């Protein structure tokens, strides 16, 4: 019996909260087209991310990847910090 490998989503977002231990909250923004008027609208999603080494800080741009559920709300883990926040 062969098992298919699940595709793990990788997304880029900005850290909006680093107050929890080993957990960061990131904001992912995307543009979607309005179905009737055609105007592009910004939509956002907040995710809780597992950060084992507490590497990411507020304002950092990070790449995260989907993983097994770590808790009730955490299903993503930090892959790397792409860009440090100014300051």
UniProtKB/Swiss-Prot annotation:
Gene Ontology biological process: translation
Record flagged with keyword RNA-binding: yes
This protein's record includes keyword RNA-binding: yes
Any one Pfam family match given in the protein's UniProt record, by short name: Ribosomal_S17
Top-level taxonomic group: Bacteria
InterPro entries attached to this UniProt entry: NA-bd_OB-fold, Ribosomal_uS17, Ribosomal_uS17_bact/chlr
HAMAP family xrefs: Ribosomal_uS17_B
PANTHER family (UniProt xref): 40S RIBOSOMAL PROTEIN S11 FAMILY MEMBER, SMALL RIBOSOMAL SUBUNIT PROTEIN US17M
NCBIfam families registered for this protein in UniProt: PRK05610.1 (NF004123), uS17_bact (TIGR03635)
Name assigned to this protein: Small ribosomal subunit protein uS17
Organism: Thioalkalivibrio sulfidiphilus (strain HL-EbGR7)
């Amino acid at each position: 019996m062969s098992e298919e490998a699940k595709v793990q989503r990788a997304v880029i977002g900005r850290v909006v909260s680093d107050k929890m231990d080993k957990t960061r909250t990131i904001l992912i923004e995307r543009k979607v087209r309005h179905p009737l008027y055609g105007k592009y609208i910004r939509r956002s999603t907040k995710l809780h991310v597992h950060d084992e080494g507490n590497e990411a800080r507020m304002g950092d741009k990070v790449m995260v990847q989907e993983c097994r559920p770590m808790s009730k709300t955490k299903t993503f883990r930090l892959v790397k910090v792409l860009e440090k926040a100014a300051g």
